[in-house]
């Protein structure tokens, strides 16, 4: 890609960050109801980050309109602005993000929920805050694999789906794909390889050609009467179907 086009994208990204920071100071309060000025500002943020990086977001299927736990596979940090551009939703992220300069503050003001590193106690705490958000009719996005992948779907962990059971919320599977024009599983610019920094990821995406993200929404179901394991199994199976990826012959972990 030409240096002129990369420079244009970079300048536009800088303008989006500057404008978005001002809007965040004025309007964001650390929660994200599905309607209202906070939701509009956050979606503006995500939509314009995608545009400034030159990455179209293609939507297939329909997001559920009621308070929903959206359960997705996870490939890239760009999954967040991609989903956030079409969903008024709060994301669950690792606690380390909260301390990042500027980005951590912006994420917190946008209503991000955090999970501590650890076992059952950390999961129980995350379940409580997620269930509270769902009970307030806020949407929540969960990347159920617990890590970024190379495009091959890993097992969906079930522990944090307890939040939907506790809140009596809806659960909807979401599949994310970054088509590779050269025939690979994922466009290489989207991959979060070897603990790459956000700056490195953004640099690759700024220079990428023919890059887009596809988001597929599966059928939403009520969590009422289901166990967290059943919900994990359902969402993982549906995501695999949406991406046409076969299930490996390994045991589930929770």
Region spans (language model):
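Catalytic-site beta-strand/loop segments enriched in glycine and acidic/polar residues
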Residues: 133-161
